Design a protein with these regions (language model features):
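Internal intein/HINT superfamily modules and their associated LAGLIDADG
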Residues: 1-280
Length: 280
């Protein structure tokens, strides 16, 4: 016979809460404590803990603690990427843990694949044929209240595009990896060539909030910031001149082991053409 959790002593109730927070599934809790999954789910929801929906078992897994502490290149990079292009889905109106994900154009699928590998996700990569950016979209969406809470704690918020603020929980030795991830999500490395001459120039732009643009300018000690007149609360951080662009790329890439292939290849083009003491 199934037991009533509310009739259990407080110590057992706390053990159930702790078991769920340590990623024990509702099915495992049911077997261990003798309460039905539905009863456990309602108990946890009443305690403010979101639970998985449907039949109350987890279909896919990932490293739920990946963003708990930002202490490696990989974590700093992906936090920066999530700042730029990540999102959170809040399931506040029904049972179900919140979700987080990345959606990119298909020509950047390598980044989705790398993210999936970094967080050890078993979730499938899905395709969206809407072609809103001229090509198919690819996405990875994962569910975990623990991971979502850690992302929120690190500054990744729902609807963050207008309110994003500089990171406060990334140590100085890892900041350049964070910036590289942010660049891969919201930055552009552009190539310009005058029709009347052979000179090629490069520029870097980040599209973000005023607070983030100002932080980038102060952190990197170069570049300029200016507003996007057509989009509310949107600012650009811009770096021009081949040598300054090269300097910023060196800062982001010199000891890197993870990046978006498309932008890294553009950096290699810049490096091959202008190297250390060439260009303007």
């Amino acid at each position: 016979m199934a037991i009533s959790i509310n009739k259990l002593d407080e110590n057992i109730q706390n053990q159930i809460i702790e078991a769920y927070q340590n990623n024990m599934s509702l099915r495992e809790i049911e077997n261990h404590f003798g309460a039905t999954r539905n009863t456990v789910s309602k108990f946890l929801e009443n305690k403010g803990l979101k639970t998985t929906k449907g039949n109350h078992h987890r279909l896919y897994f990932h490293d739920f603690d990946f963003f708990e502490t930002i202490d490696t290149e990989e974590k700093a990079y992906w936090l920066g990427f999530m700042y730029a292009d990540g999102y959170i889905v809040n399931n506040e109106n029904h049972y179900g843990e919140d979700e987080f994900g990345l959606t990119l154009a298909e020509d950047s699928i390598d980044s989705i694949e790398k993210f999936k590998a970094s967080i050890k996700a078993t979730n499938p990569i899905r395709y969206d044929d809407s072609k809103s950016v001229g090509q198919r979209l690819v996405k990875l969406v994962c569910r975990s209240q623990k991971t979502v809470n850690d992302l929120i704690d690190k500054g990744v918020l729902k609807g963050k595009s207008l309110i994003l603020k500089p990171p406060t929980k990334v140590s100085q030795p890892l900041i350049h990896h964070f910036i590289r991830g942010f660049f891969d999500g919201d930055g552009s490395l552009m190539r310009y060539q005058n029709k009347n001459c052979k000179h090629i120039s490069f520029g870097i732009d980040f599209t973000t909030t005023y607070e983030m643009a100002k932080w980038l300018q102060e952190t990197l000690n170069m570049g300029s910031i200016f507003p996007e007149k057509r989009r509310e609360a949107t600012w650009y951080y811009s770096v021009g001149g081949n040598q300054q662009v090269l300097q910023l790329c060196h800062y982001m890439y010199d000891d890197a082991s993870i990046w978006m292939d498309r932008k890294y290849n553009r950096y290699k083009e810049l490096l091959e053409k202008y190297g250390e003491n060439q260009g303007t």
